[in-house]
Amino acid sequence: MVDITDIDSIRKFVIDNNIKIIVNCAAYTNVDKAEEDYDTALEINYGGVCNLTDVCREFGIYLIHISTDYVFNGRSNRPYKTSSECDPIDSYGTTKRLGECYALEYEKAIVIRTSWLYSEYGKNFYTTMINRIIERKETNVVCDQVGSPTYARDLAEFIIFLIEKQDEEDIEAHTGLYHFTNNGCCSWYDFAASIEQLRKSKGRNDFIKPCKTSEYPTKAERPQYSVLDKTDLYEFPYEPRHWLAALRHCMMNDNKIKEH
């Protein structure tokens, strides 16, 4: 494992392994904790990205960096384009914006903004909801924040698609900023309710309850609407599947569901 806050560690890893492309998925992602631990979030989300970018520039290698929908304020009512003005409203979004700006100054960098990332592994919204449903615990989920869930497998496949382009054509023709999420949008409540419905457990299936953001106060403010416009993907061409189709795929692969 490489510590991205240690530039010497990155440089050594690149030299020892003859790296040609770096894909940076590392980030400080605890949105609420970032409000009180801003320095650490900044060190990772900005300082770490600066280190990666500088090493990539030093060796002339490509950088693919993952960013977030939280660079927007969420006050729009239409999908945000890559050209839309950024205005983060929390510390997490602010540090991620600083990082992506630095990366985009490098001509061999690709920055991919994504949103509501989940998978059947680790700790994320999906696994939290599955655990709550299996444990038959009532859960209030906000119904007035809208975005696009993104299955981590689908994001990974898009990244692989970009990397494989270097075998077909110059990847440098496709550097810059892109948005990638699964198609469609929903509220967090819709997402959670869909998980509950698709699980199709016997007996009661109403453990997920809607609530307003005002009823669920958090330390960090979150965008009310953060749907990302993916028009730029069509130039490849590349079209992500709908978030519900991706969710079904995730749940089919989830061993925890099979066990319960």
Predicted regions and their residues:
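Catalytic helix-loop patch of NAD(P)-dependent Rossmann-fold dehydrogenases
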Residues: 43, 48-51, 71-112, 116-119
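C-terminal amphipathic/interface module of NAD(P)-dependent oxidoreductases
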Residues: 221-260
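NAD(P)-dependent short-chain dehydrogenase/reductase
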Residues: 101-148, 152-161
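Mid/C-terminal beta-alpha module of Rossmann-like enzyme folds, strongest
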Residues: 165-219, 258-260
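NAD(P)-cofactor binding segment of oxidoreductase domains
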Residues: 36-64
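SDR active-site strand-loop-helix element
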Residues: 22-26, 63-68, 73, 112-114
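NAD(P)H-binding glycine-rich loop region in Rossmannoid oxidoreductase-like domains
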Residues: 4-44
